[in-house]
Amino acid sequence: MEVRYKRKVDLCFRPPRTVRAELSRPYGILFSNNAKLLSYLGQFERIITVGDVVTSLVTRSGIRPFLSVVDGKTRRNVSISGERSSEVITNEAGILRFSAMSKIKEIMYGREPRSLFVNGEDDMMVIPIILYGKNGDLVVYGQPNAGAVCLENWEGSRWRVMDIFSKFTAELC
């Protein structure tokens, strides 16, 4: 008889207080005009959206993101959006779970468009999307009280995100 112990362990990566200010600033082009944002998106083949408002705006305009990530909340309040996502992941506020990063890696290396619903908070999902994305991907995420940020993925953006992520501390969830 063979016995295997398959304990499932998840790591949580937490940013130090000094990095939180870095995470709150926009990286990329900030759009406060929806028409200009949607026009800009036309230049890109693979678009990834993070956030309920941005995802709703993009999909209502007829653009199908390669990956859309939502958490059912807008500014920490429950959203009125009824959109259902195909897969659910868990990621609590203020952290980045290894399991969430692994799911995003799987999707970003795949070929099929997908959507994720985050049980928790979607803000940190931009980090693995940039780390595992392809050159030329466009990540669109909401910037509270300002608009939407478009960040094109390339070696420089990956380097910057990796620099920020390297300052996180890991702990068991």
Swiss-Prot record:
Reaction(s) the record says it catalyses: 3'-dephospho-CoA + GTP = GDP + CoA + H(+)
Name listed for the protein in its UniProt record: GTP-dependent dephospho-CoA kinase
Enzyme Commission identifier(s): 2.7.1.237
EC category: transferase
A molecular-function term among this protein's GO annotations: kinase activity
InterPro entries referenced in this protein's UniProt entry, alphabetically: GTP-dep_dephospho-CoA_kin
Alphabetically ordered keywords of this record: Coenzyme A biosynthesis, GTP-binding, Kinase, Nucleotide-binding, Transferase
Source organism: Metallosphaera sedula (strain ATCC 51363 / DSM 5348 / JCM 9185 / NBRC 15509 / TH2)
Binding residues for GTP: 52-54, 71, 73, 122
UniProt function note: Catalyzes the GTP-dependent phosphorylation of the 3'-hydroxyl group of dephosphocoenzyme A to form coenzyme A (CoA).
Family label: Belongs to the GTP-dependent DPCK family.
Record GO biological process: coenzyme A biosynthetic process
